[in-house]
């Protein structure tokens, strides 16, 4: 609330609380986007996605969610956006739910796996190291070495994730044990995975390729192939889909913004005290 008021109030009308105090000041520069850039929150749990919806904020999931599970998250997110529980944290509603997936695209599936799976697993392991189980000594802990030693114990078994000829998912499974895979495969495999996320209503998929020991040249080749052979299907009609979405959500967004306290006017009598002598 404080930050977004600094974005839109001219001057910022000040704030006083136990944790933060600031007098009336003209905070510049103001954002180029009006009223301010879209607000997002990174989410690892469904509860945080629900919280994002109550604040009218975009939800960016780092939990490598499967399409079927994402369907439930999407339903709850947009139901909440359309409910009286949504009181925007900013002065615009950013109704979007995005998921993060590792990606490496190549016409040969095994090549895509060899180029991308270890980096993808290191990305997932390093997130868990910092947010879940890691014991870190700054400047001394070698996360890559620990990853190589412990990866299978934490759900990053290479043999399971490296299966070929499978329908892609956030994870692949073998005898009930899962391992992170994501969008690592051929253009056809990646396209089919993205279709599944699109069908359940996920707005955006954010790819992670630049992780671990992944080579720059391989990443560039993967992105170029994706742009040529996969992206056009999802880019076509994007403008019309976004327009229809905004029209569908317009009444809910208008109602939500009406529940948000508007920008304040600072008293014209406020004077900044002279600090020098």
Show which residues each predicted segment covers.
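Flexible loop/turn segments at secondary-structure boundaries
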Residues: 48-49, 68-69, 106-108, 212-217
